[in-house]
Amino acid sequence: MPFDSTNADLSVIPVKTPAELKRFIALPARLNAKDPNWITPLFMERTDALTPKTNPFFDHAEVQLFLATRGGRDVGRISAQIDQLTPQPTEGRLDGHFGMIAAEDDPAVFNVLFRAAEDWLRARGRTHAVGPFNLSINEEVGLLVWGFDTPPMVLMGHDPVYAGPRVEEQGYAKAQDLFAYKADETGDIPEIAQRRVKRGLPSGVVLRQLDMSRYDQEVQTLTEILNDAWSDNWGFTPTTEAETRQLAKSLKQVIDQRLVWFSEIDGEAAGVVVFLPNVNEAIADLKGKLLPFGWAKLLWRLKVKGVKSARIPLMGVKKKFQTSQRGRMLPFWMMKASRDMAMSLGYNRYEISWVLEANKAMTHIAENVGGTHYKTYRVYEKAL
């Protein structure tokens, strides 16, 4: 049965059919059509992300998508999900998540969407709703609340100015803020770090690029490093082996092996930095479609013409090395190597994101390599 609101012609339906999923995916492009900074995600990629057979997130999570309709017209959407791998912050608290929020600027639409998602979570024993997560903390996270004047980088979201206030009207408050930093070729590592870099790597430290000939093994090494490095961060949820394989498959056509740098200490994998070409720069005019000619355009722009911007979505050093003198320098050595390579390949700007506001070590690194905070994404929470 549809979820009926007090507005007689406004209802919420659970997404059950391929046709309804198609409507769910298509809605944000229509809602944001007049926003010059909106970039429509690829429909094929979004379909895979929201289909249990192609997204291993569903192996450990329960998900329900909802569409809000008015008079036969789609006016909003939201997801509700429970990730069984999510650690609970305190005893007696059970978090459920919401995500994929997009709606017309109408309080009634936001109200019926959140009521549907909250009722679904409450019926499954959840005590709090946290989000947005699209769909997990290891994917797109947070609602854009500051920095609306530029397009989003690859795998980052973009939301209208009214979205944050509308969510807060539903009783949600800030749980965490996530920062995005911009940097260009004029930025560099701090002078004191530069002096150490110029002296060369100390004994036992090795920097190397991604080896595509053993790509799957390299992605497993990357996941091992990041699962360890991030394990004490707020909201940390480990990436599973199946998710690692899916990550490897999805990034293989996009990643540039020259822009992925591993570090080793005494023969052990210790850290990693990934510069990811900004695919959004290449798909901005494709309107989410790869057929009939979108694939050719995308590959030509990425592999031949090249894009000028990149994002650093992944950076970390294993905890056992973080307090040692060599370990503390690893981010700067890796950043220097990958940044210099990116600039030599024609990139002129990049984003470091997302960085937890509370992660002072990482905000310090971002600022000390020339990064300027220019976007804020907010994760909200509400007691149910």
From Swiss-Prot:
It comes from the Bacteria. GO terms for cellular component: cytoplasm; membrane. It comes from Caulobacter vibrioides (strain NA1000 / CB15N). Its EC number is 2.3.1.-. One of its GO terms (molecular function) is acyltransferase activity. It is found in: Cytoplasm. It is an enzyme of class 2 (transferase). Involved in de novo bacterial ceramide synthesis. Catalyzes the condensation of 3-oxosphinganine with an acyl-CoA to generate oxidized ceramides. Can use acyl-CoA substrates ranging from C8 to C24, with highest in vitro activity with C14 and very little activity with acyl-CoA thioesters of 18 carbons or longer. May have a preference for monounsaturated acyl-CoA substrates, as it has a threefold greater preference for C16:1-CoA over C16:0-CoA as a substrate in vitro. The bacterial ceramide synthesis pathway operates in a different order from that in eukaryotes. Furthermore, phylogenetic analyses support the hypothesis that the bacterial and eukaryotic ceramide pathways evolved independently. Its main location: cytoplasm. This is Bacterial ceramide synthase. GO terms for biological process: sphingolipid metabolic process. Pathway: Lipid metabolism; sphingolipid metabolism. Signal peptide: none annotated. It catalyses: 3-oxosphinganine + a fatty acyl-CoA = N-acyl-3-oxosphinganine + CoA + H(+); 3-oxosphinganine + tetradecanoyl-CoA = N-tetradecanoyl-3-oxosphinganine + CoA + H(+); 3-oxosphinganine + hexadecanoyl-CoA = N-hexadecanoyl-3-oxosphinganine + CoA + H(+); 3-oxosphinganine + (9Z)-hexadecenoyl-CoA = N-(9Z-hexadecenoyl)-3-oxosphinganine + CoA + H(+). The keyword Transmembrane helix does not apply. InterPro entries: Acyl_CoA_acyltransferase (IPR016181), BcerS-like (IPR039968). Keywords: Acyltransferase, Cytoplasm, Lipid metabolism, Transferase. Disruption phenotype: Deletion mutant cannot form bacterial ceramide. Mutants are impaired in growth at elevated temperatures but are resistant towards the antibiotic polymyxin B.
